[in-house]
Amino acid sequence: MASALGIFIDRNIIKYAKLNGTKDKLKVESYGMKYGQNHKELLKQIIEETNSAKSNVVINASEIHYEETSIFSMLKKKDYDKAVEVAYEEITDRQKLRPELLEYGYILSKDPADPEKLHVLLGIQEKTAIETRANLIGQNANIYSQMPIGISIVNIYNGALPAIIVNIEEDTYITEVFNGEPVRVTRIGTGTKNIISTINSEENSISKSYEVLRNMVLPIDDMDQISFEGNEYAPVIVSEIMKIVSEIKNIIKKNTGIYRKIYITGTGATISNIETFIEKLIDDVECEILKPSGIEEQKRTPIKEYVDVNSAIALAGEALRI
């Protein structure tokens, strides 16, 4: 049976999930997290502990730059690559980038604003960043691909309606989904990074700081006068979430009437009441936790247990949902 290991590398944490099965019915074989900044050693441990030396490994790409463009929808499929290449070269020329130092990939989707066009979401990365990340794995396993998490996260979403997926890791990745495809990704330097740093200054342990964060409960009774009583870390958590909410509001404002659904995932999704908290701050939307679609629920592990490693599950899905 085919299997794949998804690995999401962040500054202070590495999340992993090994999946096996077929495209529409996947099983989580193992999952977990490692804490610290010695990424090379932690990755070696993960590959050994999950017996993944011969499995396909998908890791999140680093330092991705996103661009948007379009091509004519009347083109034949065999001409898509060339049309995107021309559009990409126009972007690199305009921005005075050096294409020989870069790699790019793209996602096509229907253009909501123009039926005669296909929307193109480009992910551009420096070749040196690709090599640096590949060297972390070395000869320990086979790297199937390096994928932007802002694009891969759609692997675990199967909704038919337009939606905004908010993946709150150390940074936050906001993915706009239209017709089942990612059309725009916004990365903001707000997420759990500052929260963990604040907690760690008291706890002096990254792993314990993450556990403290996961046990947080956001107050939702009175949104006009939020009470921080009995929760010393609540102010920094609320401050970070407010910044994320502000970005979501900007996206909704630019796309009036399109997005009515928001999904929260990542470490931030483990904070109790976060979906209700955000829903109360944004008019005319529903907000819920993103449960990974296509994953077989197991008796001893309910689906909600996987939410914290959704980023890794989504990456593993790249190798199994072709």
Q: What are the residue ranges of the model-derived segments?
A:
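Gly/Thr-rich phosphate-binding beta-strand-loop-beta motif of the actin/hexokinase/Hsp70
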Residues: M1-K34, A53-N60, Y157-E202
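N-terminal phosphate-binding loop and adjacent alpha-helix
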Residues: L26-N51, K77-Y80
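Glycine-rich phosphate-binding loop plus the immediately following alpha-helix
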Residues: E131-G150, N179-Q225
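Glycine-rich phosphate-binding/hydrolytic loop that grips phosphoryl groups
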Residues: Y157, E288-I322
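Glycine-rich phosphate-binding loops at beta-strand->alpha-helix junctions
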Residues: Y259-D283
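Active-site neighborhood for divalent-cation/phosphate handling
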Residues: E63-G159, G294
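Short glycine-rich phosphate-binding loop at a beta-alpha junction
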Residues: T50-H65, N142, N255-G268
